[in-house]
């Protein structure tokens, strides 16, 4: 016997999770609905591998000299650095560039899959998670960006999120770049300070205008005593940035007018405002007013966005880990990234896309009761009488007949007795079990026990003697009538579930 000290400890790596059947079914149910909407819009599925050459990830690497920083990387036999994909956008850029001559332009695609982050895990922060992306490559007009926003709105509603419980918030990176240029932060030399400004604005919902003011200036001291160094902007520059974030009006037209005033005289900023105005016109033409909102506070953190940026936000309250009521918040976002594909091509390649955080959206739908898979029906289990190996072929025929009729079924293949088999069937959420002992076999019959009805009746019968004598929810039928009898039981259970859900 092996020494106990030699036993390997079973443990899950930090930042990763196992997914159980209900989670998998819920995810597939949700993603099937998303695919339906994307297909309706004329997007095509594509799949790229989990592994890419590290240099193909480009700006996704925080430090080019340390490829393991932020991504999971390894070297192959040729000493080429390979990495698990960090998101789904960089692999798409590589795929489009590699197949550019044969793909239709614009190229409209969607894909879902796992992405990996070599970062410190924490509550709600995982090293492996799923994204669902849609992108249009080769469309320079903001109509492609507007379409992304409208498609996301339709997706949320198809998933059961009511109008008024979500908003697609839209901004334009060019408008903010115009503001940054106006306060003297133009050019590559100010890239770090520009990024600090972006990060400060991104905290508007969390810290409010005064908190952002501190982050734009010398810095902010939080309640725990931790100090975050600010962007060190002068007061006049801070006021200009805050005027931009406060430009939201009562409606899109008012917001656009306010933004025009903020960037007046700056060509890049004015171009961005005009793009927002063009998108606003498309939203109205499509009937999306109120569902898609121009919002100057939207600043996606990724540096490669070059034009419109957008975010899908759920507006209903949930209870956080501290028992506080908070707005659920973002479940996805995206924008225009004209520079990503052109890294491979050496020529401008316009692109825009949207990414959904699958796990986060699943959590939202479960909170709303829109993703219930608790009524999943397990397989019918054909029990095997104790040590009855001679009649396995007979049991197997029953299972095959049920499967041919489209009924989920399995023959018990373990080595336990009848009591343990019944417990197994219960854990499998079996709707019923099929039993054939020697007496039933001689008579050409089978017993079918309705486990759902039996569980209900057991609550009404307190006397064990009465229970054994009444044998509730158990019927005996001819062996050739097995399929029809099982189907009747399953249909009755389905009707009961439908009635209970009303």
Curated annotation (Swiss-Prot):
One of its GO terms (molecular function) is ATP binding. It is found in: Cytoplasm. GO terms for cellular component: cytoplasm. Pfam families: HGTP_anticodon, tRNA-synt_His. It is an enzyme of class 6 (ligase). It catalyses: tRNA(His) + L-histidine + ATP = L-histidyl-tRNA(His) + AMP + diphosphate + H(+). Keywords: Aminoacyl-tRNA synthetase, ATP-binding, Cytoplasm, Ligase, Nucleotide-binding, Protein biosynthesis. The keyword Protein biosynthesis applies. InterPro entries: aa-tRNA-synth_II, aa-tRNA-synth_II/BPL/LPL, Anticodon-bd, Anticodon-bd_dom_sf, His-tRNA-ligase, HisRS-like_core, HisRS/HisZ, HisRS_anticodon. Its main location: cytoplasm. Its EC number is 6.1.1.21. One of its GO terms (biological process) is histidyl-tRNA aminoacylation. NCBIfam families: hisS. Homodimer. Belongs to the class-II aminoacyl-tRNA synthetase family. PANTHER family: HISTIDINE--TRNA LIGASE, HISTIDYL-TRNA SYNTHETASE. This is Histidine--tRNA ligase. It comes from Brucella melitensis biotype 2 (strain ATCC 23457).
